[in-house]
């Protein structure tokens, strides 16, 4: 557990620039996102580098300054193109180069968390998955001595069953590589498992598993993505908002015991982390409502009557 990564209270924030930001009085400059988050009493932003790290040093330094001014934490989401399990050496080489560019940006912008997807693996069998995981771990270990100290990669759980990133995969990566920590996207866990996070206890069981495999200190290292999701036979289908309802339940993997809302639910999640005395970073990726989803979770956390 890195003490610099531990907070006295949970940090609630957003992924990227929510649509509501561009409808606000702060919309004239993207750098105003930090003041906007402070205005909303939120604590964090995860900057998306989906299609590559393109931010220039000057902009990164400006963001760093504003984040400090408004006391907003920053994490980076690495490009989706990182595929360390590929059988093509050229693809692996480009993936490692993208990781190094993320580390450079993290140093400049004063972020110590880089979230990445373990990605695809060649083949379709369980054996192919195991081999892909071995290759990913091998390539991560190969850069151990070349990365800056105090900045960590966070391996994110996958939403699609055909990808690396099951909860078991993430634990195995974190066990093998000292500079990798777990990013639990609970909507992805819900989707990957075919829809299982319908209760506080089911989320608590996920936390128990991480604690059992990685130790109690690992609980404070977890970085969360939290929002509801629509699920189909392949896993995650679509991000949803907390206030969305299901119009045609026959299209969803639900049974009569569950209502017409999407899961996982914020109250189940907050109660589970409170039972574990966790104070993590929680990034909301709810559909077109990241900031309101983050506020919902923060309000539940500080509400005295939640049980």
State where each predicted segment sits.
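N-terminal pre-domain/capping segments
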Residues: 1-101
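Acidic (Asp/Glu)-rich catalytic clusters
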Residues: 3-7, 33-41, 54-75, 102-110, ...
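Hydrophobic faces of well-ordered beta-strands that scaffold small-molecule active sites
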Residues: 10-17, 45-47, 74-78, 114-116, ...
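Active-site beta-loop-alpha junctions enriched in small/polar residues
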Residues: 15-20, 48-52, 79-83, 119-121, ...
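Distinct, well-ordered alpha-helical segments
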Residues: 23-34, 56-64, 126-144, 160-178, ...
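Active-site acidic/histidine proton-transfer and metal-coordination neighborhood
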Residues: 68-69, 85-184, 191
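Acidic/histidine-rich catalytic cores of soluble enzymes
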Residues: 142-240, 246
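A short, acidic, amphipathic alpha-helical segment used as a generic capping/interface helix at domain edges
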Residues: 205-215, 250-277
């Amino acid at each position: 557990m890195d003490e610099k990564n531990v907070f006295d209270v949970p940090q609630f924030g957003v992924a990227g620039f929510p649509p509501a930001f561009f409808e606000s009085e702060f919309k004239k400059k993207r750098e105003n996102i930090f003041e906007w988050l402070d205005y909303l009493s939120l604590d964090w932003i995860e900057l998306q580098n989906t299609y590559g790290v393109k931010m220039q040093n000057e902009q990164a330094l400006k963001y760093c300054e504003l984040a400090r001014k408004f006391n907003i934490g920053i994490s980076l989401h690495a490009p989706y193109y990182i595929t360390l399990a590929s059988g093509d050496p050229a693809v692996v080489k480009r993936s490692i180069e993208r990781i190094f560019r993320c580390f450079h940006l993290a140093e400049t912008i004063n972020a110590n968390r880089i979230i990445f997807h373990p990605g695809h693996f060649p083949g379709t069998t369980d054996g192919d998955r195991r081999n892909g995981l071995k290759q990913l771990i091998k390539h991560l270990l190969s850069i151990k001595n070349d990365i800056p100290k105090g900045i960590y990669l966070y391996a994110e759980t996958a939403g699609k069953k055909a990808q690396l990133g099951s909860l078991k995969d993430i634990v195995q990566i974190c066990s093998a590589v000292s500079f990798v920590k777990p990013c639990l996207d609970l909507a992805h866990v819900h989707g990957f498992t075919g829809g299982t996070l319908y209760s506080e206890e089911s989320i608590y069981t996920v936390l128990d598993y991480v604690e059992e495999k990685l130790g109690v200190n690992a609980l404070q290292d977890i970085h969360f993505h939290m929002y509801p999701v629509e699920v189909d036979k392949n896993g995650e289908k679509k991000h949803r908002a907390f206030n969305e309802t299901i119009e045609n339940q026959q299209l969803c993997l639900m049974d009569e015991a569950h209502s017409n809302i999407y899961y996982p639910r914020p109250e189940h999640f907050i109660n589970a982390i409170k039972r574990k005395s966790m104070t993590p970073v929680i990034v909301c990726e709810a559909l077109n409502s990241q900031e309101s989803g983050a506020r919902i979770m923060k309000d539940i956390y500080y509400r005295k009557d939640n049980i």
